[in-house]
Amino acid sequence: MQHKTIMDKIIIQGARENNLKNIFLEIPKNQFVVFTGLSGSGKSTLAFDTLYAEGQRRYLESLSSYARQFLDKVGKPNVDKIEGLTPAIAIDQKTTSKNPRSTVGTITEIYDYLRLLFARVGEQFCPTCLEPISSMSASDIISQICHLEENSKIIILAPIIKDKKGSFNDKLESLRLKGYVRAFVDGVMVRLDEEIHLHKTKKHTIEAVVDRVVINSENASRIASAVEKALKESYGELEVEILQDNAPSIRKHYSEHKACFKCKMSFEELEPLSFSFNSPKGACESCLGLGTKFSLDISKILDPNTPLNQGAIKVIFGYNRSYYAQMFEGFCTYNGIDSALCFNELNKEQQDALLYGNGTEISFHFKNSPLKRPWKGIIQIAYDMFKEQKDLSDYMSEKTCSSCNGHRLKASSLSVQVAGLKMADFLTKPIEEVYHFFNDPTHFNYLNEQEKKIAEPILKEILERVFFLYDVGLGYLTLGRDARTISGGESQRIRIASQIGSGLTGVLYVLDEPSIGLHEKDTLKLINTLRNLQKKGNTLIVVEHDKETIKHADFVVDIGPKAGRHGGEVVFSGSVKDLLQNNHSTALYLNGTKKIERPKFEPPKEKHFLEIKNVNINNIKNLSVQIPLKQLVCITGVSGSGKSSLILQTLLPTAQTLLNHAKKNQSLNGVEIVGLEYLDKVIYLDQAPIGKTPRSNPATYTGVMDEIRILFAEQKEAKILGYSTSRFSFNVKGGRCEKCQGDGDIKIEMHFLPDVLVQCDSCKGAKYNPQTLEIKVKGKSIADVLNMSVEEAYEFFAKFPKIAVKLKTLIDVGLGYITLGQNATTLSGGEAQRIKLAKELSKKDTGKTLYILDEPTTGLHFEDVNHLLQVLHSLVALGNSMLVIEHNLDIIKNADYIIDMGPDGGDKGGKVIASGTPLEVAQNCEKTQSYTGKFLALELK
């Protein structure tokens, strides 16, 4: 009986990793389990750093001795015992790939099956004339020639050389020895027994005359013999010249290979590599399969509205005495151009000469020496200036490849069709449309029985994988979408879909907030997908704050009661029904006892708007929208409706560029913004890491580390030893541990496995050498200080205002639990975003800032959301404007104004379908067909 209990449960005994307080917990297997609790309470520590880490360690133990030699260095989680643990797979929010060749299709392997489908049953078309491509047998060719007009005079030719450079004496001699009398050389018939001289540096075409014959029934066998001889001589190809009286002759091309007889082009047999943009067989030769090319961007080299002599040409000005600046002055003098004019004020001829050169020699002085040089134009000058450094990044832009139009493949591959659609069609359609296409078997009725048999298993695999993507709410994405551009939440749901497709059973899946980035409309679809994964015989542990996900769980574990040192305990474990009867923080929000309510602030007396006009990007077409200033405005809508396109890809870069150039109410790239005079800066607080190395941490990012180093350097012992502030930096030699160079960890290369970070055995993770650690403030070394939580450090430095004020802002945004020296790479996206928000709070406020945040509630418990809402409204109360892209209804219902995009994602989105106060959007939801409004109406009841 005891054995059965262990097998049915995962039993954790004595978990003490990070802030966990000797946890004992039993988790039922093969169920949907949710871990919840405040940010920093220890949920992720228990789920990822304990359960998943131990599962991985046990997996490594099962490997060969070569892999096991590293196990002493790979730390075991601080836990006494875990029983009943099954193989573990973690699906977190990290972006899937940084490789520009990775797409949604390649990650999910759907593209591999599409390549196979196109290679096996694809119909080839000529990319030039769009005619079908076919191959012919020798008997087919003979039959077609014999059926030419009766008594036609024809010449049967064997192509030997096609448009190649060389003298080809050996080829001509070989034809003579084989008994050929005549040949066509560059379109002219010559006798092979005469001397033929070909220029070896020019391209030539040589065709052997196999026979000259008249079309009639008597010559049928002769024609057949000549055709077979020609095909053998030219490896499956031949030409027929039909002679006509009083008219030019007609040429016909025949081939045993796949060919377009109209364009006289041969094509290789299709194989999966023909559709791989990572292979020379399929990749576009211009962009090498990337779909984009980098080229010089004139707008980055030249400011058309700045006088030429005042730095308009960014690539050469700033170096007033430089070689190119002097040459430019000579160019202006020679061409009679007034350098006080702007580029836009020059005529077309002058503009072209300036940009592209005009070949004229320019006289100028450089270092007191007269020089004469041809003016190449500033674009060529830019290339010349940076040829050695090979760094043109500041002056270049990534643009769609004009050869393949961004589709990455060769023209011959892009012209192949399956069911009337090309590969590019499948890669650019929303996944929802691709799913419906493959779900309709009538599209493939045109295939013959053999082709259907080949296609059937491939179509089944494609349909399954596409359905799983559609089922997790990713129907708006495309298979060709660059993997680098998808969010952490999207990336996680892609991997969930891939796992369902893998069909694994008996696995422990650990997921980190899979509902991130999902509209309420799609949350139930995600829950059903997770259920499908669980029903295959797997255990799901989901770290989550979403109400719906928690309510649909089989078992809930609530970690708390607070964050950091005040957390690390299991405050509840059991069913949702029992949870709702509890009286701790999570239960109070779920059963409605406690609610998130907006703070009371006076609304602005003056109403100003920021108006964006003529937005055309992705699925947004010719959109204009007004955004109220000095308010908390939420941009809402289902995934893929155009929120990020409108705000992050249009408003943000356009407003920043115009404000940086002090240009109010002007347009950029066709987009016009009205109302910028009410702002002095636009700040985007994203979820990108605050640093990419172990030496980046909250203390260094917020600037509090500088004040701490000053304080340590002011200690009496430090002054006696002559230690400056740099002694207490782990970024430079002197005070840091040189074995790990101030990282605290050392990277171990695992070769066939991911690299592992292990604690430095010299400094034991302290980052500093022993001499530096001897300097103490109130009995604590600088390493001790970095190991403190923000909350502990705030109490410790209470009498040091310069330090305390910066720490207070971190507490204000709900980050009192993180440690000052926490490695930046271990912080979640939500934590990184709030650290950036804290840094902004510590700066002097102008009251004219537009803050843009993308899903700031990521990783936040209800209590933390309440806290964040107070901070956002406090910034608005100072006169600033807050623009938040958000799905969380607790933030949306407490906003001043909502702009809802939709009605759906992808091609069905891109419009503003509702706007107004939360109450107005909710009341008009039936009329506007706003999903946000419908859920808001339920929330506001």
Curated annotation (Swiss-Prot):
Keyword Metal-binding: yes
PANTHER family documented for this protein: UVRABC SYSTEM PROTEIN A
Main location group: cytoplasm
Single GO BP term: SOS response
Family the entry assigns: Belongs to the ABC transporter superfamily. UvrA family.
Domain ABC transporter: 316-585, 605-937
Full protein name: UvrABC system protein A
Domain of life: Bacteria
Cellular component annotations (GO), alphabetically ordered: cytoplasm; excinuclease repair complex
Organism annotation: Helicobacter pylori (strain J99 / ATCC 700824)
Pfam families: UvrA_DNA-bind (PF17755), UvrA_inter (PF17760)
Molecular-function GO terms, alphabetical: ATP binding; ATP hydrolysis activity; DNA binding; excinuclease ABC activity; zinc ion binding
Gene3D superfamilies: ABC transporter ATPase domain-like, ABC transporter ATPase like domain, ATP-grasp fold, A domain, P-loop containing nucleotide triphosphate hydrolases
Signal peptide (from-to): none
Record keywords: ATP-binding, Cytoplasm, DNA damage, DNA excision, DNA repair, DNA-binding, Excision nuclease, Metal-binding, Nucleotide-binding, Repeat, SOS response, Zinc, Zinc-finger
Lineage: Bacteria, Pseudomonadati, Campylobacterota, Epsilonproteobacteria, Campylobacterales
ZnF C4-type span: 260-287, 737-763
Compartments where found: Cytoplasm
InterPro entries linked: ABC_transporter-like_ATP-bd, ABC_transporter-like_CS, ATP_grasp_subdomain_1, P-loop_NTPase, UvrA, UvrA_DNA-bd, UvrA_inter
UniProt: ATP binding residues: 37-44, 637-644
The protein's role, per its UniProt record: The UvrABC repair system catalyzes the recognition and processing of DNA lesions. UvrA is an ATPase and a DNA-binding protein. A damage recognition complex composed of 2 UvrA and 2 UvrB subunits scans DNA for abnormalities. When the presence of a lesion has been verified by UvrB, the UvrA molecules dissociate.
Subunit text: Forms a heterotetramer with UvrB during the search for lesions.
